[in-house]
Amino acid sequence: MELFGVPIQTMYLYTLIIAGSLTLLFLFFGDVFSGLSEGIPFLNPTLVLSFFTCFSAGGYIGELVLPLSSLLIALLSCILSIMLVVLLHIFVLVPLSSAEESLAYREDDLRGRLGKVITAVPVDGFGEVVIEGIGGTISKSAVSFDNQQISYGTTVLVVDINNGVLSVTPHEPI
């Protein structure tokens, strides 16, 4: 079968090369175009490019291997591509989009947070405090702000941070 005077097998190959190249470019420069698909989530460029890549690859291989009509091969390739794109969307893109970005924090962000002593803080000495949050758990060295001993398991309030060491005081809920 021919399409626009070109054999369908050649069209599949050209589409595969173009879609594969665009997919590779989108992989490297996708952040530049990230806002284009905000309003229409089902037209995610990753899914569209993946569909055309899978469709053209399936059609090309089908034309080489299967002794079926070109329309049936195109239909089978389209169905296979839709299934692969749906699986890609459900099992890769949705979990990646809902994943936490990082555990990056500034030390100033810890000021005013509550933590729990995991190594007792002696008078004029160092202990350790763990601060739990949505992004994860942070463990930091700590000294007593009031120069008093703070025992294990005490809930503390971070008052200040000096050179990566937290100054804490026991927290008393109101």
UniProtKB/Swiss-Prot annotation:
Its topology with respect to the membrane? Multi-pass membrane protein
* Transmembrane feature ranges: 16-36, 47-67, 72-92
Q: Where in the cell is it found?
A: Cell membrane; Membrane raft
User: What does the UniProt entry report for the null mutant?
Assistant: Alters assembly of FloT membrane rafts; more diffuse rafts are seen. Double floA-nfeD2 deletion mutants are wild-type. No visible effect on FloT membrane assemblies.
Q: What induces it?
A: Expression is sigma W-dependent. Up-regulated by alkali shock and by infection with phage SPP1.
Identify the keywords attached in UniProt to this record, alphabetized: Cell membrane, Membrane, Transmembrane, Transmembrane helix
Spell out the Gene3D superfamilies in the cross-references: Nucleic acid-binding proteins
| GO-annotated cellular components | membrane raft; plasma membrane
Q: InterPro entries, from UniProt?
A: NA-bd_OB-fold (IPR012340)
Record's function text? Plays a role in assembly of FloT membrane rafts, probably recruited to rafts by FloT.
Q: Which family does it belong to?
A: Belongs to the NfeD family.
* Identification of the protein by name: Membrane protein NfeD2
- Source organism: Bacillus subtilis (strain 168)
Q: What is the lineage of its organism?
A: Bacteria, Bacillati, Bacillota, Bacilli, Bacillales
